[in-house]
Amino acid sequence: MKTAIVYYSEHHGNTKKLLDAIAAQHEVTLINVTKQPETDLSAYDRIGFASGIYYSSFAKQLIAYAQEYLPEGKEVFFIYTHGAPKGTFLNAIRRVTEAKNCKEIGEYHCQGFDTFGPFKLLGGIAKGHPTAEETADAVAFYAKM
């Protein structure tokens, strides 16, 4: 299946580390929404959305991209890294994919080093994440889909 993963990974590049590991072992197109993003996704069978978590949600830029360019009825999946414990991080992106009648086929998440907002005052949280094991788990998640 032809697959693209649209992503936003800033600050420490935690999410991009997972995607690079996936792309090293599988044929997948990585689309960075901050750099010349591809806008025609119709040729892809599956579309992943990957992001760090910002204020308990996927990046606004990624959500806006999905609203504008995600075709109707595609298979979608989510990959994300977060500093804080798991929460309702997928609500906003799921609203977009559900409105476009997409079929969700999976999600993978793990902690990522986070110095955003108040965590900076503490020297960050989740240092050393994603780990090699978490990265391997992301690759295994992708392979199983």
Which role fits each region the language model picked out?
Residues 3-4, 10, 16, 23-31, ...:
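FMN-binding flavodoxin-like domain, especially the glycine-rich phosphate-binding loop
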Residues 34:
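Catalytic beta/alpha-barrel core
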Residues 37-43:
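Short amphipathic alpha-helix with an adjacent loop that forms part of the alpha/beta core around
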